[in-house]
Swiss-Prot record:
GO terms for cellular component: cytoplasm. PANTHER family: HISTIDINE BIOSYNTHESIS BIFUNCTIONAL PROTEIN (PTHR42945), HISTIDINE BIOSYNTHESIS BIFUNCTIONAL PROTEIN HIS7 (PTHR42945:SF1). This is Phosphoribosyl-AMP cyclohydrolase. The keyword Metal-binding applies. The gene is hisI. It comes from Delftia acidovorans (strain DSM 14801 / SPH-1).
């Protein structure tokens, strides 16, 4: 069990989860925010691809299992408090890569302008054609 000690250093929340930020390795773009449980983080490190925990479905979610938009993980980092994980990834699927279920490059596609949220990044692929 010695090899898994690094997992014990993570400060899991009351539900056994840790917040995760996926950041594109080459551009620095923040792609998405999600959650991982212990099993998801262990599988991510083992497989070199992002595996998250879906709170709504209460199960592991292999990023790209439905869309084909896989995240290859190059590096797993943890913050100074050991309670947030950062994945340095390469996002695949319809260049420049689609991370968001809306068909956009990043889940952070809206900006606050004049007191309103405005979508500023384009839809790269219609989500209807992604999730069949």
């Amino acid at each position: 069990m010695q090899a898994m000690n690094w997992l014990d250093q993570v400060k899991w929340d009351a539900q056994g989860l840790v917040p995760v930020i996926a950041q594109e390795k080459d551009t620095g773009d923040v792609m998405m925010f999600a959650w991982m449980n212990r099993e998801a983080l262990a599988k991510t490190a083992e497989l070199g691809r992002a595996v998250y925990f879906s709170r709504s479905r209460n199960k592991l979610w292999f990023k790209g299992e439905e869309s084909g938009h896989v995240q290859t993980v190059h590096e797993v980092r943890i913050d100074c408090d050991n309670d947030v994980v950062l994945l340095k990834i390469t996002q695949t699927g319809h260049e420049p890569g689609i991370a968001c279920h809306t068909g956009r490059h990043s889940c952070f596609y809206s900006v606050l302008r004049d007191g309103q949220w405005q979508a500023v990044d384009p839809v790269l692929k219609d989500p209807e054609s992604i999730y069949k």
